[in-house]
Amino acid sequence: MSNIDNLTSRIIKDAEDKKRIILSEAEEKKSKIIAKKQEKAASEEKIIIEKAETEAVAREERIISSAELQARNEKLKSKQTVISKVFETTIEELCNASSDDFKGFVKTVILNSTLAGDENLILNEQGKKMIDSDFVAELNREIGSKGNITLSDKTGNFKGGFILEKNGIEINNTFEALVSSLKDEMGLEVARVLFS
């Protein structure tokens, strides 16, 4: 019986030893798997954090860029408003010219133009108060032999200046048209003077 006890004891001891080895190997595998998973999780966490930081920086740059663009556009819009106001003020000042200054303007433009001499002079309501048939007669005398400009009965719908019309063709010398043509040419110069 002692052999059986020894054999049983040895089998139990061998089983215990195998159990310890198996449990030790399982614990080692478990530790390796956990360490590997923790390493992978840390690596993925690092990648996710780096990606989030990169996206945050890119988003911040986009927001700043958008804000700068919007500010630049608002500034440009304000400058364009100021420039437009300058040209509108110029038209108003021309419209408020004295009768003598307005007559001088009409005379200078007509005498320096290449005309047939028989055009109709179209004025707005204010212009009709300043220019009369005596002025037109004097103008025709200065033009010379081809001078036959007539004062039109038609009242122009414009702020100031005048229109010369013949056979449906108009030469537009209104202040609005003259300032508008200068606006394209002088817009940059006006901006330079105003905003430098």
Swiss-Prot record:
GO cellular component: proton-transporting two-sector ATPase complex, catalytic domain
Cross-referenced InterPro entries: ATPase_V1_Esu
One family name in Pfam for this protein: vATP-synt_E
Keywords: ATP synthesis, Hydrogen ion transport, Ion transport, Transport
GO terms (BP aspect): proton motive force-driven plasma membrane ATP synthesis
GO molecular function: ATP binding; proton-transporting ATP synthase activity, rotational mechanism; proton-transporting ATPase activity, rotational mechanism
Record HAMAP family: ATP_synth_E_arch (MF_00311)
Protein family: Belongs to the V-ATPase E subunit family.
Free-text function comment from the UniProt entry: Produces ATP from ADP in the presence of a proton gradient across the membrane.
Entry protein name: V-type proton ATPase subunit E
Organism this protein belongs to: Clostridium botulinum (strain Alaska E43 / Type E3)
Gene name, Swiss-Prot/TrEMBL: atpE
